Amino acid sequence: MSTQLRHCGLDFGTSNTTLAVARGNELSLLLPLEDGKPTIPSTIFFDFDTDRTLYGRAALAEYISGTDGRMMRSLKSILGSSLAEEKVRIKKRILSYLMIIGGFVGELKARAEVEIGERVLVSDAQG
C-alpha cells in the first residue's frame, strides 16, 4: 500500500453531493456513496419512531413512505448565512443547522472510508 496520501474532494450540492478521491497524479475517481451510484441526494431524514437519521435516497424513501419524521433538503443554501448558527428542534433535540450539515458530512466521510479502505482526514482548504 502506498504511503502517499489520497486527496478527497467533496462537492456538497444543493440537490446532490459527490465525493472524489485521488492519490498523487492518478485520475480522480467518484466514489459510489449510495447504492453503487456516485451521487447521493443532499437529504436528511430524522425518523421520529426509531430516532434514526437517514441520508440520501434512504432519507427520501422514508419520507415518501409516510414515516413520521422530519426531512431536510437544500441545506447548502444555509451555509454562509445568518441561519447557519440557528437552532431547530428535531423531536426532543435542539440542533444547529451547522451540526446537522456536519452529521451529513460525517456520514459521507464514513462511507468514503468504507469504500477506499482507508481513514479519511477532514481539513479546511488551508490544511
Identify the residue ranges that each predicted region occupies:
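Phosphate-binding loop and its immediate beta->loop->alpha context
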Residues: 25-127
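Gly/Thr-rich phosphate-binding beta-strand-loop-beta motif of the actin/hexokinase/Hsp70
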Residues: 2-30
